[in-house]
């Protein structure tokens, strides 16, 4: 039987942790996943490595407020600000999902100073996949 490996301990108080290095990526891709409950904005380099991300919940919204266009706007602004620290200037946008924050997130990426190139909808379309949820009775 091999010897048990010890788990890496958390850094001690006062000990410096390794700082994330700043990448210099002028062109990237913004992936916006907008569901009925949340909006997640991820900005990657051309190879798909994540540079910055933000979501409606991460920005500070809880519950049904996460699904609002305003929450998506703040999430996109937050992700754009983080990405600009890494030198991102231009992004191609890939939108996925049926949520209400799709267009708002794209507009706020532009307003935050990122130049938006191509916009593509990559929402997966089922070829008659699983049965949809039953109709709501309110």
UniProtKB/Swiss-Prot annotation:
One BP term from GO: translation
Membrane-spanning parts: none
Composition bias, Low complexity: 1-12
Biased composition (Basic residues): 13-22
Leader sequence segment: none
Highest taxon listed in the record's lineage: Bacteria
Alphabetical keyword list: Ribonucleoprotein, Ribosomal protein, RNA-binding, rRNA-binding
Annotated stretches, region: Disordered: 1-27
A molecular function GO annotation: structural constituent of ribosome
Family: Belongs to the universal ribosomal protein uS11 family.
Function in brief: Located on the platform of the 30S subunit, it bridges several disparate RNA helices of the 16S rRNA. Forms part of the Shine-Dalgarno cleft in the 70S ribosome.
SUBUNIT field: Part of the 30S ribosomal subunit. Interacts with proteins S7 and S18. Binds to IF-3.
Protein name: Small ribosomal subunit protein uS11
This protein's encoding gene: rpsK
